[in-house]
Each structure stands twice: as C-alpha cells, then as structure tokens.
From Swiss-Prot:
Entry's family note: Belongs to the XseA family.
Cellular compartments per GO CC: cytoplasm; exodeoxyribonuclease VII complex
Subunit structure: Heterooligomer composed of large and small subunits.
Native organism: Parafrankia sp. (strain EAN1pec)
Domain of life: Bacteria
EC number: 3.1.11.6
NCBIfam families in the cross-refs: xseA
Protein name per its UniProtKB record: Exodeoxyribonuclease 7 large subunit
Molecular function GO terms recorded: exodeoxyribonuclease VII activity; nucleic acid binding
Length: 401
C-alpha cells in the first residue's frame, strides 16, 4: 500500500525506514555472483563484513555473514576472489544502510569460470568480433605507441626496453593501471579511452605478465572486449605467456605471445631496416649498372655499323649506283633508237619496193580506160577507145588501134 503524505502532514524518518525495510525484506533470499573486496574480520566479533563488487559495472554491495560461513570457504576467500553467495537483502533503519545477509558462500572454481568464458567466447564469435576481416593492420612505423600495463611491472620494462632498442626514436605513451582485482577493468577502460582519443597514438599495447586464471580475468571482461573492438586505434594484446589465452587475444587486432613479442611486432628493428635498405640499394645499383652496360654495348654496336662509322660511304655507293643506272639507261635508249631507226629505213625500203611508183620507175606503164579502170587484158578494149597511159614521169592520152 503506497504511503501518503503532504507538506502539512509529512512522514517521519522511522516510517520511511520501516517501509523500506518491509519492501526489501519481501525480496527473499537470492543467489548473487560477484568479486570479493574489503574483507573485514574484526577480533571478538562473529560477523564478517565484506564488499561484493560487480565484475563488469562499477556497482558494489555491502555483505555481512557469520564468521563460520567465511571460515568454511577456507583460504580461497581473499580480495579479488570470484564467489557466488546466497543471502537476503536487508535494510538497517538505525543506520539507513542496505546489506546482503549471507548464509552460504561458494567459491567460483576454475571449471565454472572456464565454462562462463567459453559461453562468452561463443557469443562474441557469433557476433563476428573474432573475424580476421575486421582486424586492422599495424602501422609500419608508429609516431607514438600507447602502453597500458601495471605500475613498475616487468611487462612495462620488457615493452619499453625492447621497443627503444629496436627503434630508439619511438615515443611511448604510458598508462599505468591495475592489471588484476576489482579495479582493473575500469582503469584499463579509462586508459584505453584516453589513448584512443589521442590522434598521435597509432597503436595501443595492453600488456601484463603471466598469472592464474583469476588474475587474468579482467582481460576476458566483456566490457573491455567490446571497447577494444570499438576503438579507432589498432590494439595489440600481450597478456601473460604463450599458453595464456584471455579473450582479449581474440578481439585484439594482433595477438603477441609475450610483452617482448609485442615490442617486436609494434616497431621495426632499425638495424634490420638499415640492412634491408642497404640490400635494396645494392640490388638497385647492380640492376642499374647492368642496364647501363647493356645500353653501352648496344650503343657501341650501333656506332660500329658501317652506316654510322662512315655515313658518306653509303652516299658515295648510292651515287655510283645512280651513275651506273644512268649510263645503262642511256645506252639502252641509244640502242633502242638505233634499232628503231634501222627498222624504219628497212620498212621505208620495203614500202618503196612495193609502191606502184617504183614499178613505173622501172619502165612499166599503167593503162586506164575512160572510166579510170586499169586495163589488164587486150580484150577489155576495142579499137578507137580512148586510153590514159600513166608512166613514171606522168600521164598522156592514147587511142587503141
């Protein structure tokens, strides 16, 4: 039943506290999973106080439990341990605080953790977050390298020393964070966001040395994994040793087996690059020298050819050829004219020999009647017919007798 109140008739604090206690007590006992922090075992008290923190969100809940319940868990109940508790939420009106009264605590064993990680891995894989197609290539020579690692850790030393040994001019943007425990995920997320916003940082390395499954749990946190996927800058995962495989290895753009391997993957080796440049220069020099020698030989061959060794020699030869052709054509033309002239003389002689005038010149005469017809037989004329006689010197009239 909702409470009613007015400015003139306000409710006292005890009423509100009692109502809150009644509402919260209706929830009953529930199973809750979280990470243990701030364990307080006060001497002479049978109650142990601790804080149960959500491993993903920045949310915590105060927990009270009998000392016997904590002792039953054994030495595994330490800060950072993942547990499942069974308890009932309670509200203390006198202090106005909310707490979870726990009657059973179960450590979350490695098998259960691995099963949960496998389920999360399957979910992220189904979303395509592990796909090679979405992974970005690292820059060849980054201007600045972002490094997220533990404070004064061996991983920090390995990455920085190896990176600067390989490329002394590399600039490291270091962000020191907690790499295990309840604060690790939030600090890593803040450092990742800070470095990703810096345009000068071209690659980010998240590094940590080896550890137990529980120690490496922050690097399998779903919030961190999705932040790495959404980052603009390529991310290199360098967590633990070769055998350690947190889920960060699957979503990162590059997975390095160790922090030292991450330094080798992020920046090139100056000595190797110098040797490579020198080898390429030598190769280019050899190729260019070979090409020059080839072109030099070709030029020498061209210069040795007669047409280039003595350019006028060919002209002189051509001139002699033209002169010979002219003389030959002149001789041929003269011979042809002489032959044609002789043929013309012979033809004229034959024509003259066959001409009637030539016959008349030999003393013959041509007799024609009055009609001009040539008389070939005496029978063709009669006595007294007028005739015309043609001789070589001309014609005269005659009469048949």
């Amino acid at each position: 039943m909702p409470l009613t109140s007015t400015p003139d008739e306000p409710l006292p604090v005890r009423t509100i506290s009692r109502a809150l206690g009644d509402w919260i007590s209706r929830l009953g006992r529930v199973w809750v999973e979280g990470q243990v922090t701030e364990i307080s075992r006060r001497p002479g008290m049978n109650t142990v106080f601790l804080t149960l923190r959500d491993p993903v969100a920045d949310v915590s809940l105060r927990v009270t439990c009998p000392r016997a319940v904590c002792d039953a868990v054994g030495p595994g109940l330490v800060d950072g341990a993942r547990v499942v508790v069974w308890g009932k939420p309670s509200f203390h009106p006198g202090r106005g605080t909310l707490a979870l009264a726990v009657v059973e605590i179960r450590p979350l064993g490695a098998g259960a953790l691995l099963a949960r990680l496998e389920r999360l891995k399957a979910t992220l894989a189904a979303e395509g977050l592990f796909a090679a197609s979405r992974k970005r290539r690292l820059p060849f020579l980054p201007t600045a390298v972002g490094l997220i690692t533990g404070r004064a850790s061996a991983a920090e030393r390995d990455v920085i020393e190896n990176a600067r040994r390989r490329w002394p001019a590399v600039r490291i943007e270091l962000r020191e964070v907690a790499v295990q425990g309840p604060l690790a995920v939030s600090q890593i997320l803040d450092a990742l966001s800070d470095l990703d916003a810096d345009r000068a940082v071209e690659v980010i390395v998240i590094a940590r040395g080896g550890g137990s499954l529980e120690d490496l749990l922050p690097f399998s946190d779903e919030a961190l994994l999705r932040a790495v996927v959404a980052a603009r800058t390529p991310v290199v995962s360098a967590i633990g040793h070769e055998q350690d495989t947190p889920l960060l290895d699957f979503v990162a753009d590059v997975r390095a087996s160790t922090p030292t391997d991450a330094a080798k993957r992020v920046v090139p080796d100056v000595s190797e690059q110098s040797a490579l440049v020198e080898a390429l220069r030598s190769r280019a020099r050899r190729v260019l020298a070979h090409r020059l020698d080839l072109e030099r030989r070709r030029l020498a061959d061209l210069r040795a050819r007669p047409v280039l060794a003595a350019p006028l020699r060919e002209i002189d030869r051509r001139e002699q050829t033209v002169g010979a052709l002219r003389s030959r054509s002149l001789r041929c033309l003269t011979h042809a004219v002489d032959v044609a002239e002789r043929d013309l003389v012979h033809a004229a002689a034959r024509m003259r020999a066959l001409s009637p005038a030539a016959t008349l010149e030999r003393g013959y005469a041509l007799i024609q009647n009055a009609d001009g017809a040539v008389i070939r037989s005496p029978a063709e004329i009669e006595a007294g017919d007028p005739l015309t006689v043609r001789v070589a010197g001309g014609t005269f009239a005659a009469r048949a007798e």
